[in-house]
């Protein structure tokens, strides 16, 4: 039997654009739109809902204005009149994945390349419909990419942007080194104003600087993660850090 996996709503419109009419999208984005209808029914599919429950067979999903309006056994879900009906017998539908540690750049020895064209498309092709970038070498590229996706100019997942790596002296020239708590607060306040959602502390950041960055971010309603080295996990936890990435090294 022919089988395939469909990621919920990706076959209809890219993530974040589902409520927009196709006519409002750029020509490049419209190429990814296979179905342009206000009401769509995906019938006779197998559904994996992401809760840990067993897969449910012969289900029907009704999408209205890009949102899931109903899910259930095909013999109980009423398909609205005028809906575009796709018989997807033999296919499986799962929720789009949320990536919590993602990048839009690629690193080789001595070289880092920003992938504003390919990265968002590859995330969607992998079923990832929302990403959190986790440290940026080009924060403005990512902020502009997020905006272009949200307005329908470019195709890609919904994005939550982490600002530049915040670290201490001796780090990569593409990271922001801070030398005092006041400096850390200033960096956080600046990038918060520019529109980032998270901050990432890196291995060389000191104790006082990390504590100040976390405090300032929390005052502004934002969060901090860290790939730490000088500061230990338990010390960062006591400071109130929101997340931790990778292993520990200096």
Named regions from a protein language model:
Residues 4-18:
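Bacterial N-terminal signal peptides
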Residues 20-26, 40:
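N-terminal amphipathic/hydrophobic interface segments
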Residues 24-27, 32-34, 47, 52-94:
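Histidine-rich, glycine-flanked metal-binding segment
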Residues 41, 83-87, 161:
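Conserved beta-strand scaffold positions in the cores of enzyme catalytic domains, especially
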